[in-house]
Regions:
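Inhibitory N-terminal propeptides of secreted protease zymogens
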Residues: 12-91, 131-134, 139-140, 272, ...
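Protease zymogen maturation seam
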Residues: 60-147, 156, 160-170, 180
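Flexible, small-residue-rich helix->loop connector segments that border functional cores
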Residues: 132-135, 152-171, 186, 198-219, ...
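Hydrolase catalytic cores
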Residues: 200-203, 223-229, 252-255, 335-422, ...
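Substrate-binding/specificity loop regions of serine endopeptidase catalytic domains
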Residues: 77, 183-184, 189, 210-214, ...
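Loop/turn elements at helix/coil->beta-strand transitions in domains of secreted/extracellular proteins
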Residues: 63-66, 145-148, 219-223, 248-254, ...
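C-terminal subdomain of the subtilisin-like protease fold in secreted/lumenal serine endopeptidases
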Residues: 238, 242, 247-258, 265-268, ...
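Active-site alpha-helical elements of protease catalytic centers
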Residues: 145-148, 152, 160, 186-226, ...
């Protein structure tokens, strides 16, 4: 035991972060340990030259240790993108030029899947946001006004800062509640990647401003919580802290568009997720993508989490979307469908986000597909249902979570796929928000 030291210092955490690379399934020089009689696990630093797995095995022999695990690393769940073409006008600056006021031209994912009262085009893979928006206006909570959604991700481009960062032009300053950066250990969870801004935009980007596109729950407030670094990777201990920050600061929905490696149990995150469930917070996670992952994994398989797979514009399963235990629902992730799909429609999920390599220049790239994008739709849907007359607003605690989950499942559209691929089916937010 002399080779181990309990460590909560920023210096040690930074050291662990700086050497996390794509070849690592866990942070080197660090363990997550929970001792008997203690409420929460600790980060434990290891002496130089100490092997992580060997140290974990040694600690597990101590009867005072409830668990000792590597500090596993999660990665953002975006499928491999198409190359970003700066000369393609479809990927560029409408967000900055203010020319794209009509979201329906690009956001097939929000259209209805069949003819209805709207004059808008239909999309086989759409989730009928228009009917949901009408239901919320009638309920006096347009766009899920008043609901707070925590986005645990690479950060969000939510404010201007020292000339280095800019707020996304389709976000308003009043859309955000205070967040935190558990990577940089400060109160500025700004995005250096683009993934988190894209996810946040799908959940709650502004509408009716003649600029950019729109978000599903466009009047919800966002809580940016940075738990992934500029490369889209984050440690279990900081993710658990991010979940608890969202609980303490009264989020009602938590979005987690990232995954740990296959078959890894991550008890420190599971414990935080159980606390979120008891607090009445709906937790949503991507199931992961083929290539970057090999099986549905945590947090999608965590306690009471809604695991979300990705569907395409043609209402097929995305060719990247993993199948297995933990798939609860499908939502639009865009991209190329799996083999056997009768539709060739394969557009991505369009949203305003950072240009590659920039923290202050924005575009609408045609590069984002995957279950990360799908999870964002379900988080937005949960916010809409919470604000609607489809459920009792007086619900609290675990009962609220169970009702929201049941409502989303019971109104989902069966795509005729195995449950291991589609769960209950493709979300239909129009039906999910119909008044009781």
């Amino acid at each position: 035991m002399a080779a181990l030291a309990i460590c909560g210092s920023p210096t040690a955490s930074a050291a662990a972060r700086s050497v996390v690379g794509p070849a690592h399934g866990f942070a080197p020089h660090q363990l997550v340990v929970k001792f008997a009689g203690e409420r929460r696990a600790h980060a434990v630093s290891l002496a130089p030259g100490t092997g992580v797995r060997r140290a974990a095995q040694a600690l597990r022999r101590n009867p005072r240790v409830l668990y000792a695990e590597p500090d596993y690393v999660a990665t953002a769940s975006a499928a491999d993108p198409e190359p970003f073409d700066p000369d393609d006008p479809g990927t560029l600056g409408a967000a900055e030029a203010g020319e794209l006021g009509n979201w329906a031209f690009k956001q097939w994912n929000f259209l209805a899947s069949e003819e209805g009262s709207s004059d808008l085009p239909i999309s086989p893979g759409g989730i009928d946001a228009v009917d949901a928006w009408r239901h919320l206006i009638e309920a006096g909570r347009p766009g899920a006004a008043g609901v707070v959604v925590a986005v645990l991700d690479t950060g969000v481009a939510y404010r201007n800062y020292k000339g280095r960062f800019r707020r996304s032009p389709d976000f308003g300053a009043g859309q955000f509640v205070p967040g935190y950066d558990f990577v940089g250990h400060d109160r500025l969870p700004l995005d250096e990647n683009g993934h988190g801004t894209h996810v946040a935009g799908t959940i709650a980007e502004k509408t009716d401003n003649g600029l950019g596109l729109t978000g599903l729950a466009y009047r919800a407030r966002l809580m940016p919580v940075r738990v992934l670094d500029r490369n889209g990777r984050g440690n279990a201990i900081q993710i658990a802290k991010g979940i608890r920050f969202a609980i303490a600061n009264k989020a009602q929905v938590i979005n987690m568009s990232f995954n740990f490696a296959c078959h890894k149990k991550v008890p420190v995150v599971d414990e935080a997720l159980k606390e979120a469930f008891e607090a009445g917070i709906v937790t949503v996670a991507s199931v992961g993508n083929l290539g970057s992952e090999q099986c549905v994994s945590e947090p999608a398989t965590g306690p009471r989490v809604i695991g979300v797979g990705g569907s395409t514009e043609g209402a097929c399963l995305g060719g990247y979307s993993l199948a297995g235990r933990g798939v609860d629902l499908l939502a639009p992730g865009g991209g190329i469908p799996q083999g056997g799909c009768p539709s060739v429609l394969a557009r991505p999920i369009y949203q305003v986000t950072l240009r590659p390599g920039s923290t202050k220049s924005f575009a609408i790239p045609a590069t984002y597909v995957g279950t990360s994008m799908a999870a964002a739709h379900v988080s937005g849907a949960a916010a809409l249902v919470l604000a609607s007359n489809a459920v009792k607003r007086s619900l609290k605690g675990r009962g609220r979570v169970e009702v929201i989950q049941r409502r989303l499942r019971s109104t989902a559209r069966d795509l005729g796929l195995p449950r291991t691929e589609q769960g209950a089916g493709l979300i239909d937010v129009g039906k999910a928000t119909e008044p009781r």
